[in-house]
Amino acid sequence: MTDRFELVSPYSPAGDQPAAIDKLVANFEAGLAKQTLLGVTGSGKTYTIANVVQQVQKPTLVMAPNKTLAAQLYGEFKSFFPNNAVEYFVSYYDYYQPEAYVPSSDTFIEKDSSINEHIEQMRLSATKTLLSRRDSLVVATVSAIYGLGAPEDYLSLRLILSIGEHIDQRQLIRHLTDLQYTRNEFELTRGAFRVRGEVLDVFPAESDTEALRIELFDGDIEQLTLFDPLTGETLRKLQRYTVYPKTHYATTRERTLSAVDTIKEELKERLEQLYSQNKLVEAQRLAQRTQFDLEMMAEVGFCNGIENYSRHLTGKAPGEPPPTLFDYLPPDALLVIDESHVTIPQIGAMYKGDRSRKETLVEFGFRLPSALDNRPLRFEEWEARSPRSIYVSATPGPYELRESAGEITELVVRPTGLIDPVVEIRPVGTQVDDLMSEVHERIKLGDRVLVTTLTKRMAENLTEYLGEHGIRVRYLHSDIDTVERVEIIRDLRLGKFDVLVGINLLREGLDMPEVSLVAILDADKEGFLRSTGSLIQTIGRAARNLRGKAILYADKMTRSMQAAIDETDRRREKQVEYNLEHGITPKSVARPISDIMEGAREDAAEKKAGKGRSKSRQVAEEPADYRAMGPAEIAGKLKALEQKMYQHAKDLEFEAAAQIRDQILKLKAASLA
């Protein structure tokens, strides 16, 4: 373990990268608060940021606009910094239905959610890392601006253990219970502990592969050992270990009882208001619901919807912002906003949507006014908490350009020598027939095609029409969940189909080097789907291929089209000039086709079998060349596969377990051969 970032990469900065890295680092070290990295598709923005992180040596938070992009970034940074703490912090809900009230139909919708334990573990690991290591890089979504437990409580509750320390076993068990760990003598699961004589086994909530064994002798800690909870194998012995709370929302008994008193005071004031307004039904409803919650908190320390009382539990004043992931960041940290033209507006929108729903709940007596303070940060609060920042985008928005005050670092020249796609304009009248002929040409070359339409209906009709004419085509739309969307993009790259039709394909920002043609239908219809930024982003989808071309079907030239074409031409001119000057021959990007979500420690967002729509999923891994593996690699692979097999069997997924068993047998046979 090291406290310094160590970048591991088979290549060195090239093209515009060296100058961009030097400028970003110099600005950061000079104390510049905001700057923008304008990088075209395929220019190595992530690699550039990784070099900046290594040079400035500061804890880093990278914000992405969605889970899919966050998973991709997590995987990339993990490969760049294999010896450092790269973490993943996104919403842990597989499914979330917030509580709401619809006055027009007098309908109350109860909160309903499904928590993904794997992502919860990764969130806990992220906060622990930020508090304990300087070489920490956390990839997060907009989930970072939502309320968490206060870091002061989180730190004050932690259990610090050292060899030779005197501690009573009962006191130790009580402390673990305060951390919300549960005692389970039959099965050691994450967030649980068991007692065997003077030996305590604890499975830390933020870990997925290591458990802690505490061996006591006559009230003294004799030995601290990390072991594999599946096999019992000893991994290493320790001198000191810190156990962090099982949840970010853990709090002391005293704080909970104090909160009960302040909630009672608020309830009394609110009931007086409702009675004075003659809102008797609302008053009766609020009294009943709140009294039940108070009894639960007094007896067991928590209740359903306890987050609505977070202001009382954290001791904040009315209207004060809640503690968030930003409170866990050290003041000298670096903040990177990826795809900032999407992420920044997202941050601004979160507070307003949450507020309108909760105001209705408060008005009609379902919640106390303090529930309004369980909220995401307002935009100005987020700005105040943000450390020194780098906005990263191919099309920075007006906010980023204004905040950067002219400090724009460009990444236009690609290390591969690839130039931006040729842009052609063709008439709308024959767009479908023209598109079909272009698609056939690309299929002959073994390339893929992206088509963007304006409406769902048009996308569906076009998909059906192309399919009827023998073209292998799929349709990407908003009803498809994150994991399935990633699988569709992977299948496109693998050649399982040739054409992908969608409405807003640019939102992924994913790498698809096999795509050589992007067709934008009805490009002259001004709107957010055909704005300058959207057009540049969509054209950029073909920028990773040597034969890249974008066709805009339009009958008139709009301002957005002209601006997008001018910017693309400007970039092409600079790229061609650089290639001629340095004798570079452009070549297509050869990016391995792997599972993007593997970046988030395997199917992190996948639903458990039996929850939601059942669908087949890949169980066994892709066949590997086992002959090239050494004995240590084979042993590690076997152990990982066995863990997967046992987990599937435990979840009653016997077919999946059998597939992995067969893979284990093949690997064992290959190792013997």
Swiss-Prot record:
Location of the Helicase ATP-binding domain: 26-414
SUPFAM superfamilies listed in its UniProt record: C-terminal UvrC-binding domain of UvrB, P-loop containing nucleoside triphosphate hydrolases
Cellular-component GO terms for this entry: cytoplasm; excinuclease repair complex
Domain spans labelled UVR: 635-670
Domain Helicase C-terminal: 431-597
Region (Disordered): 601-626
GO biological process: nucleotide-excision repair, DNA damage recognition; SOS response
Binding site for ATP: 39-46
UniProt subcellular location: Cytoplasm
Alphabetical list of Pfam families matching this protein: Helicase_C, ResIII, UVR, UvrB, UvrB_inter
GO MF: ATP binding; ATP hydrolysis activity; DNA binding; excinuclease ABC activity
Keywords (A to Z) from UniProt: ATP-binding, Cytoplasm, DNA damage, DNA excision, DNA repair, Excision nuclease, Nucleotide-binding, SOS response
Positions of short motif Beta-hairpin: 92-115
InterPro entries in the cross-refs: Helicase/UvrB_N, Helicase_ATP-bd, Helicase_C-like, P-loop_NTPase, UVR_dom, UVR_dom_sf, UvrB, UvrB_inter
HAMAP family hit by this protein: UvrB
Task performed by this protein: The UvrABC repair system catalyzes the recognition and processing of DNA lesions. A damage recognition complex composed of 2 UvrA and 2 UvrB subunits scans DNA for abnormalities. Upon binding of the UvrA(2)B(2) complex to a putative damaged site, the DNA wraps around one UvrB monomer. DNA wrap is dependent on ATP binding by UvrB and probably causes local melting of the DNA helix, facilitating insertion of UvrB beta-hairpin between the DNA strands. Then UvrB probes one DNA strand for the presence of a lesion.
Domain comment (free text): The beta-hairpin motif is involved in DNA binding.
Family to which this protein belongs: Belongs to the UvrB family.
Subunit-structure text: Forms a heterotetramer with UvrA during the search for lesions. Interacts with UvrC in an incision complex.
Protein name: UvrABC system protein B
